[in-house]
Amino acid sequence: ELAAPLYVRDKVAFTTAERLRGEGGNPKARPALAPGVPQPMTDADLDEVVALEAHVQAFPWTRGNFADALAAGYGAWVLRREGRLAGFCIVMHAPDVAHLLVIAVDKALHRQGLGGLLLDWCEQQAREHGLEGVLLEVRPSNASAVSFYKRHGYLQIGVRRGYYPAEKGGREDALVMQKRVAAAGAAA
């Protein structure tokens, strides 16, 4: 048998992917680190979803907007951490593309990979529906969101003039961004 360092023999170092699968590390810390799997949003989630949306958006969706999205059958998911709402996303499946209508993560949980997890989930749902890509709009003034989407492979494909409400009754353009995803069973 070849000699190997202790950290290799005893597997004390783990990759991020291994840690997210629950391997290695302090077992008491695992529940706090594991982001969980998005679950379908229900009417019972709406109070928390509306509160989170109001906390993170300058011009938030209303309870009626969320209820209408659920009633229309849009893909709507919540992500919980230790029973508490951490984030959510809503996607409308069009004939050729999934349209990400809204995505949000609790500000206290930013920079922990939860937004990426939700975005990956939306992309996976698009693949499973046989769609070619995910489309979204984002405010140009939201530089952190624009950067986030670019880091995740989204490209700007257009601009929607006057799309968003803005301060003092004005309007703000939207950057239209899209990422192509291979449909489930298709060659990437």
Stretches found by the model and what they are:
Residues 129, 147, 151-152:
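Structural motif
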Residues 135-137, 150, 155-176:
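Conserved catalytic-core motifs of GNAT/GCN5-like acyltransferases
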Residues 5-7, 76, 176:
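Conserved hydrophobic/aromatic beta-strand scaffold that supports enzyme active sites
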Residues 105, 139-140:
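Short amphipathic helical patch at the helix-1/turn junction of helix-turn-helix
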Residues 40-112, 116-129, 159-162, 178-188:
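Acetyl-CoA-dependent GNAT
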Residues 1-33:
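Oxyanion-binding and handling regions
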Residues 119, 142-145, 162-168:
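Short glycine/proline-centered loop/turn elements that form peptide/ligand docking sites
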